[in-house]
């Protein structure tokens, strides 16, 4: 059966389940897997037994860290699910899974409504234009309010929800939903066994008026989307279920609106209709249509690939994972063509050939071997050596480079020191594997102390990376205190600065002269460096120009104030001179490096620090303490609002002031407040703080 469904892309859905950390996303995914026949024993996140949370740390913490790809079937349709994490430190996982999805189910907590992380994940989905349906979960929870949650979708996300179901009862009395498309009640009364089929009933009398009101809104929206339907609607004719579903599907696929359903995944209520909605309203690979890329070595030449088996093979690697038996697993989304195990393909991003060993479709951490990979699907490949996240794989005779992914730089670092020599060796392996898997994990060697310094997106992110080193790679190490990843930049333009590198050591010497201009710069795509060659008339031979650029980029690794990386600058090479015998690539590299350092000192260098967007939710009575505390941490209050009877304070606060914040917040609010924090931007450090940072870095 599986093979038959595979080839008809109308029956394939590549979706993600996206949500805030506690909205019940993993439980929802578990239920989907159970109802689609993959799981026989249901895993609860509370027990640490969930299928998609398959790394040990995830089981312990009850949060989803790695997006595991899972394939399942529903009513003769195939659904490939990417489980995305809901914790803010793992936004890279969310970004990379959204890049390869066709649609998503956004899960909201029926009591809390749209929460901070939901807003962020929603914005990421909008960036990749991913159509979504909304599932208001936890309707059995004390204080659950479906209508409030729908309103938060409008107010906090600025989105247009289309209500397709109304809840029957709430909290302990939540018994089912009113289906507004077919105007019937779908109920699961009492304690529901897992997998139990719902009962179809008449709409309860006390909901008849509300159902009629929301049905009317639904029909108006549907009629407005299509001229024929509008004529029919205004002529008083009944719209068929097929017509209504077709119109909703069209608007959903175009991201004009977002269908809203509700239920309680934990209590097994509302899961089947949500699966039906995935099939009815979310796009298949054919709806998404052709994918764009560019020719190898020429970004201006746009190429396209259709989601067809007949097209040349193209795929995007979106995740690397370590497998206990197979080693490196590369998860790919195939956009066009087909490929067999054992075939050779081109990694167009790196310009290298790769051979595919085996092909699998995954079910969390179980693997199902397949005979071919075809367009429109998600697979795990074994045997790829050089491929990393964001790389394009393609047919050797039809190269294409698909749009890659951009990942933020780490904002927090810790030093890590192996306890023994054998730990030192194991650390090398661990770091290499983890860096392959996670593009936001950075590693550098502190040349002064000889320590290895690792960087990540937050304290939890680094905790988990260190934890994995201990568990998976058996590395025992001492971990230093978290350090902030500062940057340096320039604030003024230096019109002209020249530097001559001259060295005479018997025989041939070294000679290179460069004249440069330096100015502040931020590229449209967020690039933080640009090199422009303005040399004319062969004053510097063409083969030496890249060496000047390379030397400048080397110098940018260590800034001029406190040794932090230099960012956001443009270097223009204006002129220079060379010597027939003494000039070399090395000489021009040194000249480029020294010229940049000297010019940067004259360009008003400053230190930048990461600012975090902090959102604190607190009971009213602690509001003053919370704001006072944020102000004392150099925070800038951005907004205050009321949410679910609590107060929410939004502020931008330097990361350096946020270490240990959770403990302080708990003691100030008797444990009743909570907060979320996500990287926002880099900003200039005040002069007094800058002096402290420089003194600490230079030991003065």
From Swiss-Prot:
Keyword set, alphabetical order: Cytoplasm, Elongation factor, GTP-binding, Nucleotide-binding, Protein biosynthesis
Source taxon at top rank: Bacteria
Residues involved in GTP binding: 19-26, 83-87, 137-140
Intrachain S-S bonds: none
One GO CC term on file: cytoplasm
Molecular function via GO: GTP binding; GTPase activity; translation elongation factor activity
Cited InterPro entries: EFG_II, EFG_III, EFG_III/V, EFG_IV, EFG_V, EFG_V-like, EFTu-like_2, G_TR_CS
Subcellular localization(s) per the UniProt record: Cytoplasm
Record's protein name: Elongation factor G
Stretches assigned to the tr-type G domain: 10-286
Function in brief: Catalyzes the GTP-dependent ribosomal translocation step during translation elongation. During this step, the ribosome changes from the pre-translocational (PRE) to the post-translocational (POST) state as the newly formed A-site-bound peptidyl-tRNA and P-site-bound deacylated tRNA move to the P and E sites, respectively. Catalyzes the coordinated movement of the two tRNA molecules, the mRNA and conformational changes in the ribosome.
């Amino acid at each position: 059966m599986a093979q038959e469904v595979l080839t008809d892309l109308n029956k394939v859905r590549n979706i993600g389940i996206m949500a805030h950390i506690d909205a019940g996303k993993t439980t929802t995914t578990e239920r989907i897997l159970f109802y689609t026949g993959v799981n026989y024993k249901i895993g609860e996140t509370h027990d640490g037994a969930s299928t998609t949370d398959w790394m040990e740390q995830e089981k312990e913490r009850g949060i989803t860290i790695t997006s595991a790809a899972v394939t399942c079937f529903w009513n003769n349709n195939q659904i490939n699910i990417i489980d995305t994490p809901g914790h803010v430190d793992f936004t890279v996982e969310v970004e990379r899974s959204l890049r390869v999805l066709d649609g998503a189910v956004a899960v909201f907590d029926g009591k809390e409504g749209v929460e901070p992380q939901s807003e962020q994940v929603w914005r990421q989905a909008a960036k990749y234009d991913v159509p979504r349906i909304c599932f208001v979960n936890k309707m059995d929870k004390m204080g659950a309010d479906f209508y409030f949650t729908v309103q938060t979708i409008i107010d906090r996300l600025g989105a247009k929800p289309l209500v397709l179901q109304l809840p029957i009862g709430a909290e302990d009395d939540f018994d089912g939903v009113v289906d507004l498309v077919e105007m019937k009640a779908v109920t699961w009364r009492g304690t529901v066994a897992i997998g139990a089929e719902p009962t179809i009933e008449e709409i309860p009398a006390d909901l008849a008026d509300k159902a009629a009101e929301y049905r009317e809104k639904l029909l108006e929206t549907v009629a407005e989307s299509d001229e024929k339907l509008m004529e029919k609607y205004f002529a008083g004719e009944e719209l068929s279920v097929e017509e209504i579903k077709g119109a909703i599907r069209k608007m959903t696929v175009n991201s004009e609106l977002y269908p809203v359903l509700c239920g309680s995944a934990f209590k097994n209520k509302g899961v089947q209709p949500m699966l039906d909605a995935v099939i009815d309203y979310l796009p298949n690979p054919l709806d998404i249509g052709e994918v764009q890329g560019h020719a190898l070595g020429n970004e201006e030449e746009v190429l396209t690939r259709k989601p067809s088996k007949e097209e040349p093979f193209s795929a995007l690697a979106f995740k690397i994972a370590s497998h206990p038996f197979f080693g490196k697993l590369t998860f790919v989304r195939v956009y066009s063509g087909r490929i067999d195990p054992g075939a050779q393909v081109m990694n167009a991003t790196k310009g290298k050939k790769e051979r595919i060993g085996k092909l699998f479709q995954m079910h969390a951490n179980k693997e199902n071997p397949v005979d071919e990979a075809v367009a429109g699907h998600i697979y795990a490949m074994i045997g790829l050596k050089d491929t990393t996240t964001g790389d394009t794989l393609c047919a050797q005779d039809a190269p294409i480079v698909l749009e890659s992914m951009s990942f933020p730089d780490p904002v927090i670092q810790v030093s890590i020191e192996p306890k023994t020599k054998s730990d030192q060796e194991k650390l090398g392996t661990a770091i290499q594997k983890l860096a392959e898997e996670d593009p936001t994990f950075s590693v550098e060697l502190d040349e002064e102390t000889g320590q290895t310094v690792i960087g990540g997106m937050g304290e939890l992110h680094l905790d988990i990376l260190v934890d994995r080193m201990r568990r998976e790679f058996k590395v025992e190490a001492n971990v230093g205190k978290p350090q902030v990843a500062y940057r340096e930049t320039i604030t003024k333009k230096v019109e002209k600065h020249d530097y001559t590198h001259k060295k005479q050591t018997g025989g041939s010497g070294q000679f290179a002269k460069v004249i440069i201009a330096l100015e502040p710069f931020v590229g449209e795509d967020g690039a933080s460096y640009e090199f422009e060659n303005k040399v004319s008339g062969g004053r510097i031979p063409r083969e030496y120009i890249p060496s000047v650029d390379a030397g400048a980029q080397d110098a940018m690794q260590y800034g001029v104030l406190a040794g932090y990386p230099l960012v956001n600058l443009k270097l223009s090479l204006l002129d220079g001179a060379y010597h027939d015998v003494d000039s070399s690539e090395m000489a021009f590299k040194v000249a480029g490096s020294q010229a940049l350092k000297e010019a940067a000192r004259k360009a008003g260098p400053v230190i930048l620090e990461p600012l975090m967007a902090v959102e604190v939710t607190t009971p009213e009575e602690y509001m003053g303490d919370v704001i006072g505390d944020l102000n004392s941490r150099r925070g800038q209050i951005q907004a205050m609002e009321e949410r679910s009877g609590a107060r929410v304070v939004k502020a931008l606060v330097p990361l350096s002031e946020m270490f240990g914040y959770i403990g302080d917040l708990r003691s100030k609010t008797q444990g009743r407040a909570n907060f979320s924090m996500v990287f926002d931007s880099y900003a200039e450090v005040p002069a007094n703080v800058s002096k402290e940072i420089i003194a600490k870095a230079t030991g003065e």
